[in-house]
Amino acid sequence: MAMVERPRPEWASYHNCNSNSCQDLGNSVLLLLGLIICINISINIVTLLWSRFRGVLYQVFHDTICEKEAPKSSLLRKQTQPPKKQSSPAVHLRCTMDPVMMTVSPPPAHRHRRRGSPTRCAHCPVAWAPDTDDEKPHQYPAICSYHWDVPEDWEGFQHTQGTWVPWSQDAPESPPQTIRFQPTVEERPLKTGIWSELGLRAYVYPVNPPPPSPEAPSHKNGGEGAVPEAEAAQYQPVPAPTLGPAVIPEFSRHRSSGRIVYDARDMRRRLRELTREVEALSGCYPLASGSSTAEETSKNWVYRSLTGR
């Protein structure tokens, strides 16, 4: 027969001690975790409340401080503010473009730009207003108005202003010089120029002398039918007046600070006078007709350059 062993009381007490110690350890761990969570939540709440409270305090104290310092700052500004200087008025220039009378003025003195070579500028396109009428001025002149700082030597422009005077035979000859034009496009100076050498003059020399006039009296016989010298002089043809070449005035090669007035009508009149002189001289000598006209013309006209003189 099997014998069943009865539990002893010592074993029950040992089992109760082990279970109680385990429960106490678990409770202590849970309590520690809860305490950590509560501390974290409290820190977050305090931080949020402090940020809000600090913003409210900043607004309150800032408004009160600004209200107190506003009158003081205004007084200091009034005391330290210097008197306003009178600003220089803007200079308005008004120029008129006319095909008959054109005023050419140099660019402002404060702009320094390199000038192109004469050979290069000779082929540059230039905006030029055509002359529609020789006698009547343009009815609708183009008027331009722009702001431009007056250079310091602007007063010197009026003193050095010059005008082309009508040509006369007794006028002294001027040395060969250069003229330069600088038009503007869209209120900006267009950097193009014309360099024209005007040192060429044309002289006409007759190669073949004119044939003797048949109306001239014969002085071979000095007898009774002789005509007095006074009457012979009346029958001689009046020679054409010898006119000198048209001297075209020129300008200095150096840049001038003055304004030069160019009279297109006067220039056209001089060209017409020169044409009449050439026609008068060419009419005194008969030229052969036919295909040899061009050859005779080239023989009877001799052109010489006086630029080297």
UniProtKB/Swiss-Prot annotation:
The coiled-coil regions, if any, are: 259-285
Gene Ontology annotations for the cellular component aspect, listed alphabetically: cytoplasm; membrane
Cellular location of this protein? Membrane; Cytoplasm
Chief subcellular location = membrane
Location of the region described as Disordered in the Swiss-Prot/TrEMBL record: 209-231
Sorted UniProt keywords: Coiled coil, Cytoplasm, Developmental protein, Differentiation, Membrane, Spermatogenesis, Transmembrane, Transmembrane helix
Q: Which InterPro entries match?
A: SPEM1_N
GO terms for biological process, alphabetical: flagellated sperm motility; sperm individualization
Ranges that cross the membrane = 29-49
A Pfam entry, by short name: Spem1
Q: Does the keyword Transmembrane helix apply?
A: yes
Give membrane topology per the record. Single-pass membrane protein
Q: Describe its function.
A: Required for proper cytoplasm removal during spermatogenesis.
Name by which UniProt lists this protein? Spermatid maturation protein 1
